[in-house]
Structures are given as C-alpha cells and as structure tokens.
Amino acid sequence: MENQFEHFVGFQWDQGNIDKNLVRHDVENWGSEQVFFNRPLLVLNDTKHSIPEKRWVAFGKTDADRLLTVIFTKRGDLIRVISARDVNRKERKFYNEEG
C-alpha cells in the first residue's frame, strides 16, 4: 500500500484530544506519532467516518513495538490524530498479513 502521508511536516493536537487517548486507551500522544515514522505503516481510507471531513485509519508500531490503530485526518501538511488505541484481533491479523 502506498503511504501518501510520508511527507507531512508535523502533528496538530486538538485541546479536546490532547489527553483523551491516554485516559481512554493508555496511549501517549508521542506513541501515536511514532506510528507514522515506523515501518510497515498501513493506511486505509475510513469511508465509514469520513463525513464531514475525510479520515484515515493507520495501523503501525511504536518504537516499543506496540501495535496501534490510529484514526486521523489531514490538515494541510499536518496530521491531526483523532483517536489511538491498541489494535483488535482482526486488525492485528490484517497488519500481519498485509504489512
């Protein structure tokens, strides 16, 4: 899968999301960001949740090899993380087969 998000310049954190992933899923913001720098990184269009803005789902690993699902949108050259959590069983299988 081609990664169209390799040329972003940084991340944008919404005040409402800054601590949400840590509280709900025990995922630090820096862990969410690491997913985009490590390979393999699988990115799919999230057509089910792309209204009103286009969203994507990324499957990738942190530097500590924690496999995460990251829901995000793109704002210019920035990635805005909406949600990050551990992958579920189905997502882990997909990542292992496609990555």
Q: Model-flagged regions — what are they?
A:
Residues 1-99:
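Ribonuclease/tRNase effector modules and their secretory precursors
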